[in-house]
Structures are given as structure tokens and as C-alpha cells.
Amino acid sequence: MLSLSQPCFSGTLLMLLASNFLLWKNVAPVPMYASLDEYGEMSIYDLLDHVTILSHNVSELTAEMHRIFMEDVRYKPGRWFSDRYLTACHTSTLTISVSKEGARQMPGVFLVKEMISMLTAWRYPLYHIITELSYMEQAPDEIISRARNIEEKIIVLIEALRGILSKIQPGPPENERYPVWNELASLQSPDEDLRHLTLFNLFQCLVKDSRKIDSSIRLLKCKLLYNRDC
């Protein structure tokens, strides 16, 4: 069961490395491009295939991480969470839908910008999820390894989407805006139940958002390749 009472470091590094290695072996190989310039050398078709695979990987990993978390906490008396405990996600202002404003832009531009904003909004909370999990006594390695993997893939996915945006809207990059997560105090609270409730909310929101991204990328692919309402 998860506990934040004492840090437990014995053998953690080796187990994390092993877990990450096994996790990567079970995921379809996806090329990791380091910069926007390198993405510029890819065709729009290859980029769309690339982000489709990445987003599907992220969606699967978040679902697995959420499942492992729920299985772990259910054995702790009095620590069972339901959807009624779920607070508003910090990304709730991003609907990832084509509004009237978005409809006036070139096909897919508004959608790509919304997805970049949503993914960027998760970088800060994911960093702290990983940090706090690392201090948890008996925190399942499966959760930590997946959280790290998700963080890495989201960074790559953001860059790939920026590459797509540069192709469908050429010109200097615009300033990006994204919702800010402000629940760090709850995640670091001395109240153990509050810490777990905060994790529960984060995992629930991450699952929802990763599914939105996955479905939106399929929509994007349809719009850019076939230029029609999908």
C-alpha cells in the first residue's frame, strides 16, 4: 500500500531502471526526434503517424497507471475513492473542440494549439507526481516507471505537434498559453489522505485528458489528410 510516512530508497534505483527497460520493450518503437528542426524534415503524413502512435501509447500508460493506483489503495481501510471526490481538472478550460474562433483558422490549427496547451499544462504536475512518488514508502514501481514514461512521451508529443503546427501555419511561433496546476500544497500536505486524494484526482484527470488527446489526434489526421468534417 502507498505510504508517505518514510522514504524507502533501498534498491529503488535499480528497480526503476529495470521497470523502465521492461516497459519500453513492451511499447511499439517510436522514433524520438530531438528538436523542431528535425521534425521539419518529416512529411506531414509521417508526423501524423508519429503523433498517433505516441498519443495512443500515452493513453494506454495513463490507464494502466490509474488502474495500478486504484488496485493499490483499495486495500487500505477507509481509502477508497469514487468519482464524487473528483474536483475540476486544471485543464477543464480546454475543451479541445473547434469553436467559432477556431473555425476561422486553417483546418487543424486551432485543434493543434489546444492540444499543445493541454499537454504542456501536464508537465509541471507530472514532474511533482514523480517527485512525490519517489518519496513514498512501498510506492509501486509500476506507477513510478509509467509516470516517467508518460512524462517523456508527452515532451516528445508536444514537439511533434509543434512540428505539425509549423507546417500548417508557417511563420514565427506564437506565445503558448496553458492552464496552471495549483494543487502542489495538497500533494505535499502532511495529511496522508489528502496526498492520496490529490493523486487520485490527478490520475483521473490525466486519464480523461490523454483520451481527449488521442481522439483529437485522430480527428486532426482526418482533417489534414481529407480536409473535411470528420
UniProtKB/Swiss-Prot annotation:
Keywords: Disulfide bond, Glycoprotein, Hormone, Secreted, Signal
Glycosylation sites noted in the Swiss-Prot or TrEMBL record: N57
Name of a matching Pfam family: Hormone_1
Main location class: secreted
Localization in the cell: Secreted
Cleaved signal peptide residues: 1-29
A single GO molecular function term of this UniProt record: hormone activity
Annotated disulfide bonds: C89-C205, C222-C230
InterPro entries (alphabetical): 4_helix_cytokine-like_core (IPR009079), Somatotropin/Prolactin (IPR001400)
Tissue-specificity statement: Expressed in both placenta and decidual tissues. Detected first in deciduals cells early in gestation and in trophoblasts later in pregnancy.
Keyword Disulfide bond applies: yes
Gene Ontology terms: cellular component: extracellular region
Family: Belongs to the somatotropin/prolactin family.
Protein name: Prolactin-6A1
Species in which this protein is naturally found: Mus musculus
Gene assigned in the entry: Prl6a1
